Amino acid sequence: MGETSKLVTLYSDAYGKLKVVAKGARRPKSKYGAALEVMTEGHAVCYLRDDRDLHTLAECDVVRGFSVLLRDYKRMSFGSAACELVDRMTIEHESNPRLYKCLAGVLVGFEEVDDEQIESLFWYFQLRIAD
């Protein structure tokens, strides 16, 4: 892996958790732009190989950037915690479309709910994914 490459963990509804190398992602004018930022929903094209745990990211485009989350410390903290929880409770290459939808939904929720409801939403998310 070169010094302009970036190791990224993606979570997809079809493939589950994937570790990929984004070649050239650390360059100032990277083709990936904000698509590899934390808490960004995107459309990714990867070269998957059955004999490897580390795959190659060919392209990635932003579908939804959660800019409200990134500007608000409390919302960002809970969004990061939700992503971390999914990362820790999943293994690579295990598809779980329901979990993907729950994660995407809670990130949208963190952007839309009132400040007083953020913690309750996080607890609800934990209960939903534990089911």
Regions found by a protein language model. Give the residues of each.
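Non-catalytic alpha-helical scaffolds and adjoining flexible linkers that form interface surfaces
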Residues: 1-7, 11-131
